């Protein structure tokens, strides 16, 4: 599956749209000539293109009208029970069930496994996959497309590919929506899709199956509130992540900060260098955030009123810390009594993300020899599980499937910031205790397959000693 399909945005020239009142109110637009649909490469240094629409275009009204249209579905097609039975056969694990029924700890030979008390498929992911499966059953003869990977897990994405659900192709860094025809069905993934892509699909009159996680749409509602109150959205996330791209498309003015270091820089700029001295000139600011700000962003004018939002898969504690920093920054600049006019906050932290992070914080306090973190290598929430374990100094191995283990006692894994590492003899000799967790997009069966590989290595070790 091409990496270039991630982080997609539309670039639309303003002259390609004209007014049409019946679609989304007085500010609606209709297409007059061909769209140029660009996709970023996923490169950290690549720009994240944005749609250029009339200033009167109301994304909230458009989305509301879209959800009420006959060609839109976000609740499935009445095949939930049989679909969940199929998913249960494909994705569940007897080993993990044994762990859960035995207090999340169990031993197989020389291997004791301690399982995090919250792990794996979250409700939003299970719902997205279920609806995608239902769509295939509901439309057995139609061509099914998806605007991006349904979730960040190679096993699930391959399964949908086998079901003939195709990802919109990319040529010359451009997403080719021209392949989509009127009678086709297009699935929006769990991360959501930008309002620009929704507009194009609605314009084509295709059947839209929306699997966007409700927690993601909650963030969209938050940035729309920021926009209504003329607050700039400070989005804690990765500017080239699909979810953040979609969220930004619903915002007014925005800036995306990846971590506390970038948040400190922004707050130092707001305070004129009186926070920690990390910021510099306006020109340097604009260069630093050139791929992470809204069109026409001016830090001197657009950081007077700010609201916090987040990519739902980021570290909960860091999002909260950034929010507190922004609030205290506004207190320092404008006075405690005036802070409500300069800072606004709504809780947009995903319960599932929080639960999985809390569970691994608990697990790293256990006595374990190593941590096995299972999840897609492009999964943001899984990277943070790895980060938490690494920070505690535990040997931690982030793999996306059992294929990363072997031959023999060897593993290929990623560190939380993405570096690929290979290690020989990663399993210590003798009895071992391993911690196990998995990202919110990871089926239990993938974790089981990895554990079976571990058991096989330790079993071979015992046979050699016999």
Curated annotation (Swiss-Prot):
[4Fe-4S] cluster binds at residues 122, 213, 350. GO terms for cellular component: chloroplast; chloroplast stroma; plasma membrane. The active site is at residue 243. Its main location: plastid. Keywords: 4Fe-4S, Chloroplast, Iron, Iron-sulfur, Isoprene biosynthesis, Metal-binding, Oxidoreductase, Plastid, Transit peptide. Its EC number is 1.17.7.4. It is found in: Plastid, Chloroplast stroma. Gene3D superfamilies: 3.40.50.11270, 4-hydroxy-3-methylbut-2-enyl diphosphate reductase, catalytic domain (3.40.1010.20). One of its GO terms (molecular function) is 4 iron, 4 sulfur cluster binding. The keyword DNA damage does not apply. Induction: Circadian-regulated with a peak in the late period of dark phase and early period of the light phase. GO terms for biological process: dimethylallyl diphosphate biosynthetic process; isopentenyl diphosphate biosynthetic process, methylerythritol 4-phosphate pathway. This is 4-hydroxy-3-methylbut-2-enyl diphosphate reductase, chloroplastic. It comes from Arabidopsis thaliana. The gene is ISPH.
């Amino acid at each position: 599956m091409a990496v270039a399909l991630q982080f997609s945005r539309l670039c639309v020239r303003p002259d390609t749209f004209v007014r049409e009142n019946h679609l989304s109110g007085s500010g609606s637009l209709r297409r007059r000539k061909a769209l140029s649909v660009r996709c970023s490469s996923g490169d950290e240094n690549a720009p994240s293109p944005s749609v250029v629409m009339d200033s009167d275009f109301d994304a909230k009204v458009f989305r509301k009208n879209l959800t009420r249209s006959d060609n839109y579905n976000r609740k499935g097609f009445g095949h939930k029970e049989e679909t969940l039975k199929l998913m249960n056969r494909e994705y569940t694990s007897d080993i993990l069930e044994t762990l859960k029924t035995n207090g999340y700890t169990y031993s197989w030979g020389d291997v004791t496994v301690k399982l995090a008390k919250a792990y794996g498929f979250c409700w939003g992911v299970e719902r997205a996959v279920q609806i995608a499966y239902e769509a295939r059953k509901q439309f057995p003869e139609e061509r099914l497309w998806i605007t991006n990977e349904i979730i960040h897990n190679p096993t699930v994405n391959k399964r949908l590919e086998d079901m003939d659900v195709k990802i919109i192709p990319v040529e010359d860094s451009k997403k080719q929506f021209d392949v989509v025809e009127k009678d086709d069905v297009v699935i929006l993934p769990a991360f959501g899709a930008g309002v620009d892509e929704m507009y194009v699909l609605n314009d084509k009159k295709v059947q839209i199956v929306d699997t966007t996680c409700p927690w993601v749409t909650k963030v969209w509602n938050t940035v729309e509130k920021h926009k209504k109150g003329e607050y700039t959205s400070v989005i804690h996330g990765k500017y080239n992540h699909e979810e953040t791209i979609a969220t930004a498309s619903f915002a007014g003015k925005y800036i995306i900060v990846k971590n506390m270091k970038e948040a400190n820089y922004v707050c130092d700029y707001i305070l004129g260098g009186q926070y920690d001295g990390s910021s510099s000139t306006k020109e340097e600011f604009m260069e630093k955030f050139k791929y992470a700000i809204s069109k026409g962003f001016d830090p001197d004018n657009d950081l007077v009123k700010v609201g916090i939002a987040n990519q739902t898969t980021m570290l909960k504690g860091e999002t909260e810390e950034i929010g507190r920093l922004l609030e205290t920054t506004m207190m320092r600049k404008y006075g405690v009594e005036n802070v409500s006019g300069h800072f606004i906050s709504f809780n947009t932290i995903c319960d599932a993300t929080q639960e999985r992070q809390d569970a691994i914080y608990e697990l790293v306090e256990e006595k374990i020899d190593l941590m096995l973190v299972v999840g897609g290598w492009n999964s943001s929430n899984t990277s943070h599980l790895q980060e938490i374990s690494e920070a505690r100094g535990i040997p931690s191995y982030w793999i996306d499937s059992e294929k990363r283990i072997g031959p023999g006692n060897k593993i290929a894994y990623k560190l939380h910031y993405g570096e690929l590492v290979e290690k020989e003899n990663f399993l210590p000799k003798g009895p071992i205790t391993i911690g196990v967790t998995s990202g919110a997009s990871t089926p239990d069966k993938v974790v089981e397959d990895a554990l079976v590989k571990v058991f096989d290595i330790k079993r071979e070790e015992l046979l050699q000693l016999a």
